[in-house]
């Protein structure tokens, strides 16, 4: 059966502009199924026996870019150092497997860590592969560790997952711990702006979102959230925060998780996803809407969007509902590219203005006796003068 004019139009748009998905948990499926050993597993990576993602279906879906989630679960004992350090260790393992996956399949995937590299990957016919982490429990309470993750290619950090942490409150946990952001969290927003890391507000409490939206100098994203007015779920974005997101110039990337789309989750469909996109676009402008599936973070996608091969159906559905080509292109990927460009610009401005980095608060390393010995030795050498 030949494609309809709308389907042909959708395919054309997908070849003109990268459709960039804000969140996919395929790396965690690799951890669960292969224990991260992908040596000799190319056949399975092309056609996975589980989940909504594999290389074959990515190509069929004409995906232009993907933020792969280096997700690890919240520690069972978050207040204990061993749990915090284990989360950081697992995060490094997930970053490693993402990089190995990209390196192993260079004809399909290409690493990207900037707006410019998204375009170069797309023009080369590859899926631009970016990385995000899903919760500040993954940094072992260390801003130094977070900066190193940025150097390893991480370009967004979700402030929380389904647990409170030292920086922010989560959406689905009660009672609240900080009333939104902690003081450390407020300082971290500034540091994330300075280092050029996108701030992701998915999974955070409504109060944390409000505070971060007011504090951040750079646009923020919701990498995988939907609209509270259409589905009253703690993970979704309220109209009040949508208004602040508009002022912030950020993007809400609509999630495909059934529970976030419809009160009767088992009845969620492609049409519900389009409803959420159109609501946000009508409310705050299509310049502030994107796509963040959360594929492989769910057991089953909505009807009509069952896996990563279905992006053409989503684009066609938006066109059928009367969304203009220009607005569809914005939703597909131009908006999140613009946010990344602005995040990069703000970071360059802050660093250029001499903004100092936020440092970890370390325990005392030396006692006063050792400091005095070191000082005396330095003074002794000074008194000796230049040596021939």
From Swiss-Prot:
Keyword Disulfide bond found: yes
Family listed: Belongs to the metallo-dependent hydrolases superfamily. Peptidase M19 family.
Residues reported in the UniProt entry to bind substrate: 161, 235, 294
InterPro entries named among the record's database cross-references: Metal_Hydrolase, Pept_M19
Protein name: Dipeptidase gliJ
Reactions mediated catalytically: an L-aminoacyl-L-amino acid + H2O = 2 an L-alpha-amino acid
Protein role: Dipeptidase; part of the gene cluster that mediates the biosynthesis of gliotoxin, a member of the epipolythiodioxopiperazine (ETP) class of toxins characterized by a disulfide bridged cyclic dipeptide. The first step in gliotoxin biosynthesis is the condensation of serine and phenylalanine to form the cyclo-L-phenylalanyl-L-serine diketopiperazine (DKP) by the NRPS gliP. GliP is also able to produce the DKP cyclo-L-tryptophanyl-L-serine, suggesting that the substrate specificity of the first adenylation (A) domain in gliP is sufficiently relaxed to accommodate both L-Phe and L-Trp.
Source species taxonomy: Eukaryota, Fungi, Dikarya, Ascomycota, Pezizomycotina
GO term, biological process aspect, one: mycotoxin biosynthetic process
Keyword NAD included in the entry's annotation: no
Keywords assigned by UniProt, alphabetized: Dipeptidase, Disulfide bond, Hydrolase, Metal-binding, Metalloprotease, Protease, Virulence, Zinc
